């Protein structure tokens, strides 16, 4: 990969992946240090420790909850930006826009879910927290499958298969983790369920990192223009330009 030919926008999904994963692991280590949760590699419960290392439980009490809220808010914002840029990237390349629109809506709802589970801790408002978890995991999984399909269909720079196949594998892994998570939760096998949850989140974050491959080919600009009350249509502008040129002649 030639760094001189790569857009700086490729770093956005990488920053999202690295920042969010680092933030969540900081939350985990704070909670372990405070004896709020068991370490992921624990075989048995320690005296005085009541909870399995679920992410929501790790970020339930301060100071870990403060870090958790900030991480999830920033992650939601970055995910929303990625969603919009991805939609703009694919818009001129897809014939039927419904799949691209569905991907945008799904990722926006997943981002909204991140803010809910980050700002409404489990013990403070369990119902809203669980709604946020469902939105994040549910629409996040849907987003992965939609983007994998779009990747193979659009085939940007003939890299569709090279990027699409890993995304299909990650999407299948995420789906499997979601199913296993709920099965283990239903059977109260909490240590294994917590490990599956961490694996699920890391797969999500890895998936987002793959958008760097396609973002490196694109440059995005924000155009700002002064508002004019007497806005001229395109035809009127051409007419004025032609009159000006005639006067000059």
UniProtKB/Swiss-Prot annotation:
Gene Ontology BP, a term: proprioception
InterPro entries reported for this sequence: DRAM/TMEM150_Autophagy_Mod, Frag1/DRAM/Sfk1
GO CC list: lysosomal membrane; plasma membrane
Molecular function per GO: mechanosensitive monoatomic cation channel activity
Positions in the Extracellular compartment: 31-64, 119-130, 190-192
Entry annotated with the keyword rRNA-binding: no
Keywords: Cell membrane, Lysosome, Membrane, Transmembrane, Transmembrane helix
Reaction equations catalysed: Ca(2+)(in) = Ca(2+)(out); Na(+)(in) = Na(+)(out); K(+)(in) = K(+)(out); Mg(2+)(in) = Mg(2+)(out)
Regions that span the bilayer: 10-30, 65-85, 98-118, 131-151, 169-189, 193-213
General remark: Tentonin comes from the Greek 'tentono' meaning to stretch.
Role played: Nonselective cationic channel with high permeability to Ca(2+). Component of a mechanosensitive cation channel, confers mechanically activated (MA) currents with slow inactivation kinetics. May contribute to proprioception.
Family: Belongs to the DRAM/TMEM150 family.
Protein name: Transmembrane protein 150C
Gene: TMEM150C
């Amino acid at each position: 990969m030639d760094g001189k030919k790569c857009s700086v926008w490729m770093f956005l999904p990488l920053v999202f992946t690295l920042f969010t994963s680092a933030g969540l692991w900081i939350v985990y280590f704070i909670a372990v240090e405070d004896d709020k949760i068991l370490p992921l590699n624990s075989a048995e419960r320690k005296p005085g420790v009541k909870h399995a290392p679920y992410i929501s439980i790790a970020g339930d009490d301060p100071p870990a909850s403060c870090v958790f809220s900030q991480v999830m808010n920033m992650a939601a914002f970055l995910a929303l930006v990625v969603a919009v840029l991805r939609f703009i990237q694919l818009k001129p390349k897809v014939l039927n826009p419904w799949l691209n629109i569905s991907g945008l809506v799904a990722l926006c709802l997943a981002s909204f879910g991140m803010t809910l589970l980050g700002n409404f801790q489990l013990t403070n408002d369990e119902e809203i927290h669980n709604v946020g978890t469902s939105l994040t995991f549910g629409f996040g999984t849907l987003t992965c499958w939609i983007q994998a399909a779009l990747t193979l269909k659009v085939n940007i720079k003939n890299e569709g298969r090279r990027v699409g196949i890993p995304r299909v594998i990650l999407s299948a892994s995420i789906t499997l983790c979601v199913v296993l998570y709920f099965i283990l939760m239903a059977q109260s096998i909490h240590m294994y369920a917590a490990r599956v949850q961490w694996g699920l989140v890391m797969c999500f974050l890895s998936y987002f990192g793959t958008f760097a491959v396609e973002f490196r080919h694109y440059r995005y600009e924000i155009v700002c223009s002064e508002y004019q009350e007497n806005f001229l249509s395109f035809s009127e502008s051409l007419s004025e330009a032609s009159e000006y040129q005639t006067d000059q002649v």
